[in-house]
């Protein structure tokens, strides 16, 4: 039932004229990577409230602002965005700010209570990667390449 609701939500999002991708991702230049200090939003961009977008792979990062592991994963996220922005839809979910309904659905369905949490969905919404903790960029790039070649 939950999977069906998410798929329906994704279909509606695909056909909705209000479906925009987060764009212009920027890493907060004041991040202290060695501490759990609260340095503000780790990643900023336009339409930061976007959620899943059907039709291409999706990379989702769920993080907290005061987590040094999240800060390091945020840096990797922006590097991946710079390389794959035209091929992959990026979703950034900051647990310290209000979320859109689309983002809240992703948190409810996939977030396991540990940050950072990284999720990669294929173009149809099927999870290809769904883990908490830091993940190296090459692991995600391999998943992107496999998904993009299908």
Features from the language model and the residues they span:
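Bacterial N-terminal signal peptides that target proteins for export
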Residues: 1-8
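N-terminal signal peptide c-region/cleavage motif recognized by signal peptidases
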Residues: 16-18
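N-terminal "domain-start" segment that seeds a small globular fold
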Residues: 20-48
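Short active-site neighborhood of thiol/selenol oxidoreductases, capturing the structured segment around
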Residues: 53-65
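Typically the conserved alpha-helix immediately C-terminal to a functionally engaged Cys/Sec
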Residues: 71-83
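Thiol-based oxidoreductase modules, predominantly thioredoxin-like and allied folds used
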Residues: 86-101
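Structural micro-motif
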Residues: 110-119
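Non-catalytic, surface beta->alpha helical segment in thiol-disulfide oxidoreductase systems
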Residues: 122-150
């Amino acid at each position: 039932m939950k999977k069906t609701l998410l798929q329906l939500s994704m279909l509606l999002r695909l056909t909705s004229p209000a479906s925009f991708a987060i764009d212009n991702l920027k890493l907060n230049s004041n991040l202290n990577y060695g501490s759990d200090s609260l340095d503000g939003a780790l990643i900023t961009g336009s339409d930061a409230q976007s959620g899943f977008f059907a039709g291409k792979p999706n990379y989702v990062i769920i993080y907290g602002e005061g987590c040094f592991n999240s800060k390091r994963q945020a840096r990797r996220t922006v590097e991946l965005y710079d390389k794959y922005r035209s091929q992959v839809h990026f979703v950034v979910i900051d647990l310290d700010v209000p979320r859109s309904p689309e983002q809240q659905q992703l948190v409810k369905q996939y977030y396991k209570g540990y940050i950072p949490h990284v999720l990669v969905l294929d173009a149809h919404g099927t999870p290809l990667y769904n883990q908490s903790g830091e993940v190296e960029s090459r692991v995600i790039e391999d998943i992107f390449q496999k998904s993009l070649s299908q």
